[in-house]
């Protein structure tokens, strides 16, 4: 495959997304994450081990993916995604997969993909709940994240996992579904979640 996929966040969602996409033979994967690995991440960020603590997530993740698929083109961005740098970073990617953990970044990615008519596959996890959204902005009637979230959260930078906690396995469930949505969009097969919200309650 020659598709180019940018993963925003190498955390609980980004980890399984990156692993499955690398193994599937995606042409190029970019990962952006400015954070370092912490011991509290290890219950859900399965691409990392205890030997990676205090090291940059995006750089370590890229090294792990290279071992899975040495033919894969990889690019690491050790920085925070902002309105000033998003076009420079994302313009050469076909699909954006949002694994971020705050609304400010989610809205930034949503608005950029809407403007540039890119495909966006967004996921979110908190406590025992997870959601997946697919937006194909090349289609005229595709909704966007703001269509589903009518009221802007008071704290756009809130990190749900940090303050509320999250079931470790939930990241794997939602991240795998996001990776599956990427595959369906690239291959043009099956029914995607475009226009829908998939909600997972891990306690049911």
Where are the regions that the model predicts?
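Adenine nucleotide-associated cytosolic modules
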Residues: 1-204
